[in-house]
Regions:
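Alpha-helical transmembrane segments and their interfaces in multipass membrane proteins
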Residues: 38-58, 99-105, 125-177
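Short helix-capping and inter-helix turn/linker motifs at the boundaries of alpha-helical repeat units
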Residues: 107-109, 190
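Membrane-interface helix-boundary motifs at transmembrane edges
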Residues: 15-22, 68-82, 123-130, 219
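Active-site core of bacterial EAL-family cyclic-dinucleotide phosphodiesterase domains
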Residues: 191-230
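Short, Lys/Arg-rich, polar N-terminal cytosolic tail immediately upstream
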Residues: 1-20
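Hydrophobic transmembrane alpha-helices and their membrane-interface boundaries in multi-pass
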Residues: 28-103, 110-117
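Juxtamembrane or sensor-core-proximal signal-transducing alpha helices
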Residues: 165-198
Length: 230
């Protein structure tokens, strides 16, 4: 049927647009994450806090690797790696470095929703169990760290002087990443609604016409009819 062919072509077109949009969102979030980690790597290097420096270098390397995967068109794998980074990075910092105090609350857990939303966008285009597990874990960890001051016994709290401005930087970066993902999600919804709107508009304007095309056998005898909607 002509309509089915139209729908298939439109779906391919919309899927290509959605893939492009989620790729842009993933690249933007990963680049922001890399810049954030590099900033603190340099800062803590001057402060000679080598344990945090090594941690930041590891997460920066993983983020660069995820960006590389996306550039070679392994989009799902790249986003999955970046989602792992956006899960492990906040959890490690919440347990070891980002210890809540009376003057400064914990902020590292704010990166967890960014990873969950990015993972959800990827799950919509390429569902898999690991992606879903990471989304659930990210949400659960965000809830846990939001309502708890739990840290490890051997935690190494950051100095109050660092947290005074570092917290605002982390909040701003996490919020920016969340906003980017939400914006792309909104664009996806608009794309999906566009096809529905086109069909409704065509129906309201009575632009569809019904045709009957005869079906014949080898003896050229009519044995039925094919209904076409144009």
């Amino acid at each position: 049927m002509v309509v089915l062919s139209y729908l298939k072509n439109q779906n391919k077109h919309f899927n290509a647009i959605k893939n492009q949009q989620i790729t842009i969102a993933a690249k933007a979030n990963i680049v922001i994450c890399i810049a954030f980690c590099l900033f603190w790597t340099i800062y803590f290097s001057f402060a000679e806090m080598w344990f945090i420096v090594c941690t930041d270098i590891f997460f920066t390397t993983m983020s660069i690797f995820s960006l590389f995967l996306i550039y070679i068109h392994r989009i799902s794998a790249g986003i999955l790696v970046s989602q792992i980074v956006l899960f492990v990075f906040p959890v490690v910092f919440c347990l070891i470095f980002d210890v809540a105090t009376i003057d400064h609350p914990r902020v590292a857990h704010l990166f967890l929703p960014a990873g969950a939303i990015l993972g959800y966008l990827n799950y919509r285009r390429d569902p898999n169990a690991l992606q879903l597990i990471l989304i659930i874990l990210s949400i659960a960890a965000f809830i846990f760290f939001s309502g708890s001051a739990f840290t490890l016994d051997g935690a190494i709290p950051l100095a109050e002087s660092i947290r005074a401005y570092g917290g605002w930087i982390a909040i701003s970066v996490a919020t920016l990443m969340i906003c980017i993902s939400i914006f792309v999600m909104q664009l996806e919804l608009q794309i999906e609604n566009k096809l529905v709107q086109d069909l409704r508009l065509a129906l309201s304007k009575q632009q569809f016409e019904l045709f009957y095309q005869p079906q014949v056998n080898s003896c050229e005898k009519i044995i039925g009819a094919e209904i076409l909607l144009r």
